Amino acid sequence: AYLNDEHWEQLIGCGFTRYSLGIQDFDDNVLRTVNRRPSLLPVEHIVERLRQSGAKVNLDFIYGLPGQTVQSFARTIARAIDMRPNRLVTFSYAHVPYIYNRQRILEKAGLPPEAEKMRMFEQAAEQLARAGYCHIGMDHFVEPNDDLQQALERKQLHRNFQGYCPRRITAQVYALGVSGISQLDVAYAQNTKDVARYIQHTSEGRLCIERGYALQPWQRVAREVIESLMCNYYVAWTDMAERLNISAEEVKEALNYDVPALQQMADDGLITLEPTHIALTEAGSPFVRNVAAALDKMMINNNNRFSKPV
């Protein structure tokens, strides 16, 4: 919203090879409702300049915002497709006013019903499929020759706070900036959300971490299983056990492995459930968050603490 041509030239001079532009929506009415400024420069102009530099471009959108309709979001996706981004992401708006108080303001503007929100995603997915994009994981769409598509075909897809990436280039994520979250193998750490404090600490050479969470061994196991399900729509218990150097039973013990509940999902056509593995069906892939949540011990009796899957 604030960058002019000079700013973009400075970024290009840094040698970045991929840019992700957080658009949210092209509809000015929607942007005003969520107190978001439109881009200072036409997004088409920015994308073209970044392409000229040899960089790849991702466009990120959010569906489920106040003021959005299936038709308006379809127009936004159509405009994005015309730019032919290398990747396009459709994030579901997470309404968690019990965590972010300011979100209560958006309730006054009226949030789309859940059924309409789901239709926004389905319509976008249909548009992108017709345009030749491949659906990756929960929310990414990529060109057929993209590294993510190749990783998915090899069941080597990985996901972190930045989105999806091939497992072969997976590394720990170190956060820079206010409120950024570092994702480490054994812990998570979040930087302060206070801008003044962040500037003060960095100028003094101090860490800006405000809070953290150390993962217990079983949580690290559960994270691997859920990540595999969300990335590759598939978990083989023996393969997972070998990767983690534990038994298949120990893998299941780290989960909320509720056979009757999982069997109900299988009966509904969302998953295939076998003694050797669990896999999402094509019909079940849009509901991968729901399946993952059913396996997560942290979600038991805590559904209201987290954003809704759709």
Where is each model-derived feature located?
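The C-terminal cap of the DNA-recognition helix in HTH/winged-HTH DNA-binding domains
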Residues: 13, 231, 261, 267-268
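Intrinsically disordered or highly flexible coil/loop and linker segments, enriched in small
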Residues: 208, 234-235, 271, 301-304
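C-terminal scaffold of the Radical SAM
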Residues: 1-251, 309
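Minor-groove-contacting beta-hairpin "wing" of winged helix-turn-helix DNA-binding domains
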Residues: 277-281
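A short, conserved structural fragment
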Residues: 264-276
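Short amphipathic alpha-helical interaction segments
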Residues: 248-266
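Short, amphipathic alpha-helical interaction segments positioned at domain boundaries
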Residues: 283-310
